[in-house]
Structures are given as C-alpha cells and as structure tokens.
Amino acid sequence: MADVKRVYTFGNKEAEGNGKMRELLGGKGANLAEMNLIGIPVPPGFTITTEVCAEFYKHGKEAVIEMLRPEVEKAMKNIEKLTGMKFGDKEMPLLVSVRSGARASMPGMMDTILNLGMNDQAVEAVAKRTGNPRFAWDSYRRFVQMYGDVVLGMKPVSKEDHDPFEVIIEEQKAKKGVKNDTDLTTDDLKELVKNFKAAVKKQTGEDFPTCPWDQLWGAICAVFGSWMNERAILYRKLNNIPAEWGTAVSVQAMVFGNMGENSATGVAFSRDAATGENLFNGEYLINAQGEDVVAGIRTPQQITIEGSKRWAVAQKVSEEERKAKFPSLEEVMPEVYKELDEIQHHLEQYFKDMQDIEFTIQDGKLWMLQCRNGKRTGAAMVKIAMDMLREGLIDEKTAVLRCEPAKLDELLHPVFDKKAIANAQVIPRGLPAPPGAATGPVVFFAEDAEKVLEKTGQRAILVRIETSPEDLKGMLDAAGILTARGGMTSHAAVVARGMGKCCVSGAGELQIDYKARTIQVNGFTVKEGDWISLNGSTGEVYLGQVATKAADLSGDFGQLMDLAGKYSVLKVRANADTPKDAAQAFAFGAEGIGLCRTEHMFFEGDRIKAIREMILADDEAGRRVALAKLLPIQRGDFEGLFKAMNGYPVTVRLLDPPLHEFVPHDEKGQKEMAAEMGVPLQKIVAKVESLAEFNPMLGHRGCRLGNTYPEITEMQARAIIEAAMNVKATGIPVHVEIMVPLVGNHKELRYQKNIIDTTAEQVFSERNDKIDYMVGTMIEVPRAAVTANQIAEVAEFFSFGTNDLTQMTLGFSRDDIGKFLPVYLEKGILKNDPFQILDRNGVGQLIREAVFKGRGTRENLKCGICGEHGGEPSSVEFCHYAGLNYVSCSPFRVPIARLAAAHAALNQK
C-alpha cells in the first residue's frame, strides 16, 4: 500500500484526470474528467481508481477504507466547496451518487446508488430548502430502496417473487387507488420509507444505516464487490474483459430529475444504435431519476419530435393523442432540448464515435452525467463507420478498426419472410430494440432459457415484466427477449443490442403471471412452451412460428468488405463441400476453398449404396467395381465446385473418416442395408463388427485408409483431375490442390503422392492435355508439425487441421471436454475453450514450428488453417502473426475472418 494517488477530483471545468486515463479511472471516470475539461456541464465529484479495486480484493474492506479515508475526505471537501453544501450536514446536506465504471463499458452489470447521504434529518432539510417535501421524500425512498438492494442484499426470496421494495410500492399504490409512482403523495412516500426500513430490519436483523459516512463506505465497497458478482463475471467472459482490470468508483454530487414537472432524466444516442441512422434519439421521463429509465419500470417518452412521431406510428397512437399524452422533450422543454442537441453533437465530433449519454434536468438546468461510445447492433456498427468515413470524421483504417469482426455475424442472421408476416397473427406491439427476427418457445425465467437450450438445443423467447442484470445468462441463451415494461434504452434493450439479440420492449398490453407461467394479451392466452415470434424491426409479436429468410446485406457491408480486403495480408478461403456452399462463400468474398471434405459427398442417395458396396467387397477387384460407380458422381461434384470458384484455388481433401461411419450401427439400419444390398444380415453385422475401433479418431482413417486401399485414392485423384480438365475446357481457369489427411510421417505422404501423380499422368495421357495441380497435407498430427522439414520435401502446401491438432496436442476429446471444461475455465486452468479459440502456447507453437521448418525446406511453401478456428477473430490474428498465407472457415464466417485479417494487419502496423 505505497503512497500513491488513489482519488482524482473533477468539477467546474477542471479535472485531475482526463479521457486518456481509462485504465486508471475507468471509462466513466475518464470521460467525466474529459467532459469537464471541454466545458460540458457536469456535477462535481471524484473517482477512486481501478487499482483500489485490486487492493480491495487483496486486503479487504476495512484496510481499503482506512487507506482511502484521507483522500476521500479531501475530495468530498472539494465537492462541498463547489456546491455550497456539506456532506452529513443537517441544514444544507450534500447528497451524492456512487457508480461503478470499468475500463470497458459493462451496462447494468455492476451497481449504482443514488441520493446517498439521506436520513431523517437530511430529508427534512431538503424539503425545507427546496420547498418541495414530496421530492425530498421521493429521493429518500429511492435511496433506501437502492441501498437496501445493493449494499444490504434485499433481493426476491424466489424467482417467482418480485423485488421486495416493489411489492411494498405496489401495495401502497393499490391502497391509494393510483397507477403510477408519481401519483403517490408526500404522506404516501413517508409511509413507504417507514415500511422499507421495517422490511430491511426484518430481513437483515439490522437497522438501516443513518450516518452518511457509513453509507458512503458501504456503497463504495459494495460497488467494488459488484465487480465479482455473477452477472459481471459472465459479462466479462462474454466480452473478453480481464478480471484483473477491476472497476473504478465515481462519487458525484446529486442533481435531481425528480424535483417536479420542470425536471427530468434521460438517456440518448447521437445516432440510432439499432440501425445506425444519423438521427439524434433517446428517451426521457419527467419527474424521475436515471435508474427509472434504464430499469424499465416506467416506459419513457421520446426526446425528439421525429422520434416521437415514429414511436406513435409504431404504437398506432394518433398525432393528437401523442401531443397530449406523449410529447417529446423537444416540445416540452425546447430550450433545454436545444442545449442537449448541441452537446451531443459536440461530444460526437470530439470523440469521433457515436455517443451514449445520460443526462438530468434539474429545475430547467441541464447536467450531463455520463458519455461513452455507445453499444450498437452489427448493422448499426457498419453503417455508422461507413457514414463517418463519408463525412470525413474518421479515415479508412479507423473505419475498419471501428467494426468488431464477431459482430458481423448479426448481419447474417435470418429475417422474417414478408409473405409469412402478412399471414401472421399479431398479438401485442412493443418497442423495437435491436432489429432482427426471433422465434421460439416461451419461458419466463432466465434459468429456464438455459435449461431449454441444454435439453433441446432450441433457443427460447425469454418473457419478463422487465429484465434485470441477473437475467444476463438467460438472455444470452435465449433467441430473443420480450418485456412488458421499459423503452428502447432500458436494460433489456441495451444488453440485447450489445449481444445482437432480437428484443421487443415495453409491450404494455402483456399481462404476465410468473406463478401461472402465462401471458394474457388481447384475448389470447400464451402458456410456457407455446411458440411466439418477435420482430425486432417493427416491435410486433406474432403467435406461433413465423418463417424466416436470409438477410439482405447493405451496400455499406460491401464497402466495409472492400476496405478489409484492401488492408489485409492474410487471405480468406471457405470450407465448402457443395457448389451451393462454394457460391455462398464466393459471394461473401472468399478467395478459394480451403477445405472440401469429399466424404460429405458420399451420404446422399445412391452414393452411400456405392460406398457400402465397396466396404462389403471381398477383394480389390470388388472394391474397384464399386468405386467406378462413385467416380462420375465425385467428378460431377468437383466440376460444380471448380465452376463456382471461377479460378480461385480449391483444396480437396481425400477421404478422411474411418469406414465404420458409412455403415449403420443399429439393428434396424443393418436390416435395411442387408435388404438394399441383397446380402445376408450376418454379413452386414460381421462387417460392422470388423470395422469397430476402440479409438477411431486415431484409427484406420485418412492417409492410412488411402495407403491400405490405394484404389480409393486413385478413384478420387482421377475424379479431381478429370473434373478440373473438364472445367478448364469450358474456358474457366482451375487451380486445384489435393490434400492428404492425417499424415504423421513423410513416407505416408510420399506413398499417397505417388498414387496421385501416377493417376494424373494416366489422365493426361488419355486426354492428351495437362493441368497444373498441387499435392499437400493436413498438419493435424503433432509429429507432422515437429518433422515438418521432412514432410515439406513432399508437400507443396500445409493446411493445419486445428480441430484434430488441438485434440492430439492437448489430449482433449472434443466430444467429451464438456464434462470438465466449465470447471477448468472457472478455476483458471484454461482461459478459453481451446476448440473455440486457438491455444497459442501449445497448438500455436506447433504451428509456428511447422511453418518455420517447412519453409526452411521449401521456401515458397503455402500455409493455411482449415479448422473451426479459421473464423474466430483472435485465432485469425494469430495466423497473421504466424505468417500463414490464408485461413479457411465456414461460408458464413468468411466476412468475420476477412475483417479480423484486416484488423490483424492494421494493428501490427
């Protein structure tokens, strides 16, 4: 605990920190400091650094409080000086907010406390000073509610129960016959505070703390503690945020949006976070505090006239009713709106990115509480980057780096078919949050979404009155989210947008009964397990399952892909087994096929019969008869691939799986095979038993099969070469690469290459023509990697099969790792699932060694990977640094890999 600065003050257009100090002050603290420095109106406060978070977990609560006390007391005096109020004073009490602020934005994952410093004396002083006792008691009840939840652990007893404080509020409203919190009187609020405190005493056995300093230390430590809560841990895991970063804590003088009809609070975006449209938008609530907007307990109104009119059209509200009941901030407080509009524009121009801002209007005065780069959908991400490039706000390289590769996946998600929508039954309408389409069975609790996915593989629709941060895991596992309350800036909408999940919020017609597990809406009853569909673009909710179609990609997407190609070094190919897959990959910009799995061609129609005939053959002659039937089929398949790729390289892998995968293992299937093949059942059973292996992954497969039965390699080589020559004859150039799988010894490869070359020469002689082709190998056996110098004497290219290379290097079975992987991740034994993200220290080192040794033998050796890692951004980055020529992935991952390759090249420079 060396003598270092742990607290940084800000206020009155001065700050000890700045926007570049995110690592130390967190995103919120750094931006609060920066907004002060550029003249934005921000309530004064101070930020406790992220380093203290680490000390909190190392030394404990009491040690951290004693360590912080002098600096915090000094910083509090600075706030007192700037506000003219005093913390803990009985006449002019200073009230503060306590908020988390990690280096990376984690919306709703950690805790916030408002109105801290309130007690029985302070509430009377605030009432007297403002002449507004209702406001004072409303602020007091909010503080007790938030502090009770965050610091004292006042949570629902079971998942069917509601928040204990909300239950008390609902009882009070029912007792008074009112609908909204804002309809409660001062006396009602006094009774709420009394009942809140009684509930705290009953559940915790302790009195609610009244000393402001005790409250402050409790809140600071609770915010640090929230860094390791379950939802924050999960969010960090999903977004690759290291636990060691920690969170900062910002303490700020309160400004109040709940002082009456001339006060408000809101959240806004400088551009549309769902679509990317250059339209200032957001939501606000009159006579409310910030948590009311994001918590979704009240459905807010729109900030701009344009946004309000669009909302009214979507909700089928007339213009007359909109103006009377749901006016925009632009109409209600035009001068404040004008200032807010100028500030948002200033912030976007200054930070050169779309801004998410929180603000409060206290008695007609605008205050900014936060700004950050806004979370956005994949579609919005691309549009904003391309628009800002066209506007001259950012350059090409920044535009490319501004787009996260993984989020491109959202653009490729299916959308509802318009014809299907026309015939669908709309039940309610809500507010469209992230666009897209989602369909699935209804569940009402987060853990049930997890269970449905685990049991059925089907993603459900999570239906909630409003979501809370505790629902994060269920939201992740759901296909979409539907809420009865909340707006487009509520927790559900913001988190869903960040995840790329479809969400419809604020569907107020829904009557949700958690205990009965039903929804009542417009005469319909929807039970748990019934299917519904969500339209995230319109806010409509449909009964049943609605058909979907492939998404239409925008011109901005094409422009981004062009830029990615301009700045990347690493090429991107696709794993494709059919002409349809190849055409899709080509449309996404793939520069070849990096893996064509020939065995996938054997499972259709008469093909499986021919391969089974080969398996049942008693000798080579019999096998050749069966293979002759497969030859024209394979040749036709290859012709389709070569035509689809139109001159780009195509890597064809020879037969890889063991033969037992082509025969049935159940009695019914074996009987059907016997009848179809016209042989006794006993022969089928005997053959299946003879093919069985204890460890088929390491068994009779790949080049071992080709060397045992060279006639298989001959047939495939002939089909490939003949197909290439046929396509070449049509005027389409062909670049074919023949890949031998599972090589661990250069002699295995040499035997296979000799068969391929001999077969090719026979075809050339028959056709009186030639084509160029290459023979290479998959590096998936660790021995192949460490003897790559020998293998490169034969191989003209290497393709790393990282799926099997990971299995053999780590000794993990991909099919069985699920039994212990969660424990290994939790204990930190593994940082990531090695089958999702390449293990750089183990598998990665083998790849580097193989590339180095291989090119030592053959200088121009082409190297790529074709495992699932080829479409994972951080693995693509590794491949760039390792000097590979290309990565290959599934067609729908091609855009992601292309953008990741550009990121790797730009970040290296």
Role assignments for model-derived ranges:
Residues 99-100, 553, 563-909:
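Conserved alpha/beta-domain cores
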Residues 46, 484-486, 505-508, 596, ...:
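Short beta->alpha connector loops at strand-helix junctions that form conserved
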Residues 1-424, 458-461, 468-473, 479, ...:
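Nucleotide/phosphate-binding sheet-loop regions of phosphoryl- and nucleotidyl-transfer enzymes
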Residues 14-22, 434-477, 843-859:
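C-terminal accessory/binding modules appended to enzymatic or scaffolding proteins
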Residues 463-465, 484, 506, 575, ...:
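Structural motif
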Residues 77-89, 519-522, 729, 761-770:
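Short mixed-charge
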Residues 365-367, 468-476, 480, 488-494, ...:
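Glycine-rich phosphate/ribose-binding loops and adjacent secondary-structure elements
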Residues 70-73, 238, 400-454, 458-461, ...:
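Long, charged amphipathic helices and adjacent flexible linkers at domain junctions
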